[in-house]
Amino acid sequence: MPTLELVHSPHAPDLCPITIYYREFGRGRPLVFLHGGWGYGLYPFDEQIEAFQNDYRILIPDRSGYGHSTRVAGEMRLDFHRRAAEEMISFLDALGIERAVFWGHSDGSVISAMLGLEAPERCECLILEAFHLLRRKPGSRAFFDRFAARPEDLGEETKKLLALDHGEEQWPTVLQRNCTAWFRLADLVKRADEDLYDGRLGEIKVPTLFLHGSLDPRTEPGEMERVRKEMPQATMKFVSNGKHSPHSELGAFAECNALAREFLLSQA
């Protein structure tokens, strides 16, 4: 289990140093996978490791507060995505990596987009899967309300995977920190169209692929259409029968991988 130490991370500002656990496979151009808000274990990138490890050096870090990395208590900061992006730059620095392909899933896609905005020189290209644009997502509120209050209501297999990832005592905290951060973001919204990027999404100049499940339950009506308008230069692909995690879904991962490979080859 490789780890590295960061002197400081804005994603865990009250702790130092920070230990970051990461998975590493293959060799070649660096390809960094950024997990979603509930961690890596629930939506693993096993199929992508198999498909891409012969051509890429695959790195999959647990952000601080997740998995085997330094545990973090208390509320997440409202700008946790930006802070996580800064942590990922420090992660690259610690490994001596100048530039990488970033493939982010869900919250990880937001973090990847912020890397594209704030550190484009570190990004070879971006794959943004199950992307979030809006700060307030009414269609998901009941889902997150339920499991933030009663994480034990999750299915047994889901709880088992979360416990394996974060620990039996820690996984409910991981869920509650993420869910309540999204609640607080939503509750501060003054206009329904406020986005996570302060209107700057269209400033991303890094080559970008949006990879989205056609049946993603976490997507608001019109959300991806607005993304298309704000980033007409990006490639947008919808995965047939894909839900919120096409990369790990049995009926979607093969199409997901094919679309990603086509995009990556176009950037070679």
Predicted regions and their residues:
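Conserved HGGG/HGGXW glycine-rich cap/lid loop of the alpha/beta-hydrolase fold
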Residues: 14-71
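Active-site loop/oxyanion-hole signature of alpha/beta-hydrolase fold enzymes
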Residues: 46, 60-103
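Active-site nucleophile elbow and catalytic-triad environment of alpha/beta-hydrolase enzymes
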Residues: 180-200
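Short alpha-helix in the alpha/beta-hydrolase fold that links the catalytic acid
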Residues: 197, 206, 220-229
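Short beta-strand/loop motif that positions the catalytic acidic residue
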Residues: 204, 210-212
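Acidic catalytic loop of the alpha/beta-hydrolase fold
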Residues: 215-219
